C-alpha cells in the first residue's frame, strides 16, 4: 500500500469472521466505495485473520487495489500502529456483546464505524458536528447499504475544513478516558448492587 498522509485510512482491527464480524458487508461495497471516492484515494488496512481474508485478497488482486488496500495477518504491534495511524475503524458486526476496538480507537483520534448493536450501541454515539456530540458513525440495519451509508458519513466528516474536524477529534479524544475506565465501571457495578440490595455495600 502506498504511503499517502492525505488519504483517508480505514482500519479493520477484528478477525475476518463472516458469522459475527460482518466483513461480507464491506467486501460487497469495497469496489463501489473506492471508485466513488477515487479522487480521495481511500485506503484500507486489514490486520486480521479469518475466513474472509482470502476474499479480501481476491478483491485486491482482481481490481489491482494493491496501492490502496493492505491485507495482513494479525500482529499485535502492527494492530496498535493501525489504531494510531487510521482515521476510521470498521466494526460492522452482526452482534457484539462488548467490543474493544471502538473504545481503543478514539483514544488515538480514530473514529469507529459500527453496526448499532450490543456493546457497540452502548459505546458509540453517532457524530453530530452541529450539536458537538457523538464519537463515531453507526448504522441501524445489518446490511451493506447501511455500512455504505455510515462510511459516506465518515467521508463527509473527513472532508470538513481541518479546524472544524480537528476540534471534534480533540473533543472525542479528551472525552474518551472519562467514558471508558475501570473506576467508572466499578462505580456503576457498585451502584447496581446497592440498588438490588437496597443498602450500601460494605467495602
Name each region found by the language model:
Residues 4-20:
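Conserved donor-binding/catalytic core segment of Leloir-type glycosyltransferases
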Residues 10, 26-27, 44, 189:
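A structural motif in glycosyltransferase catalytic domains
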Residues 18-31:
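A conserved mid-protein helix/loop that constitutes part of the nucleotide-sugar donor-binding site
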Residues 21-23, 99, 181:
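Active-site helix-initiating loop/hinge in glycosyltransferases
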Residues 37-81, 138:
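Nucleotide-activated donor-binding/catalytic signature segment of Leloir-type glycosyltransferases, i.e.
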Residues 76, 81-179:
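Catalytic binding pocket for nucleotide-activated donors in carbohydrate/polymer assembly enzymes
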Residues 182-203:
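C-terminal alpha-helical cap of glycosyltransferases
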